[in-house]
Regions:
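Nuclease and nuclease-like effector domains acting on nucleic acids or nucleotide cofactors
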Residues: 1-110, 146-171
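Histidine-centered nuclease catalytic patch
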Residues: 102-133
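Short, compact, well-ordered microdomains
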Residues: 126-150
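Generic structural hydrophobic/aromatic packing signal, biased to beta-strands
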Residues: 47, 75, 120-123, 134, ...
């Protein structure tokens, strides 16, 4: 849609009102519960689809993005000693960890679609998604850690331990 079309549709009053709203501090706005619920459903859907794929296919053969090799190589260069078997929140979200993760994530801005979207990650690679075994990370952190788990054979146990399930969306 052309910008002229937007301004014609809104008119001068609409544009001024929009500009005044956008110039207000973010703290003045509450999170819309319906938007949060839709986001949570989308994150859960992504987790279910990924886990069902893990239950069905040899993880070493999985291709998550067109940039898998670059993501994995960069991840292991920057985090050579990070064990991805059993993670804890501190390793991903402490101030020190955030300082190290931020530049890694930003390398994929404009490269990996939705690189900064919130995505659920399993803390223990041998477990399924659950309240106790899931944490919210950026999409690029999810890709980096799951690619490492897949390439390093850590997700191999999933196919024998779990079976694909129907999506909660269809129930």
């Amino acid at each position: 849609m052309a910008m002229a079309s937007v301004s014609n549709d809104l008119g001068a009053e609409g544009l001024v009102a929009g500009a005044s709203v956008l110039s207000r501090p973010a703290e003045e706005f509450d999170n819309d519960p319906s938007v949060e619920a839709m986001w949570a459903m989308k994150a859960l859907e992504h987790a279910e689809v990924y886990f069902n794929i893990l239950c069905s296919v040899d993880p070493k053969l999985l291709k998550l993005t067109p940039h898998d090799e670059n993501i994995y190589k960069t991840f292991r260069e920057e985090f050579p000693d990070l064990s991805v078997e059993k993670l804890n929140e501190e390793k991903l979200k402490s101030p020190e960890a955030k300082q190290k993760w931020r530049p890694f994530c930003e390398k994929f801005k404009g490269v990996v679609e939705d690189y900064s979207f919130g995505t659920l990650l399993r803390l223990d690679n041998e477990g399924e998604y659950s309240n106790e075994n899931s944490i919210l990370v950026t999409r690029i952190q999810f890709y980096a850690i799951e690619l490492a788990r897949n390439k390093e054979g850590l997700n191999d146990c999933i196919r024998s331990k779990y079976k694909p399930t129907k999506s909660s969306k269809n129930q």
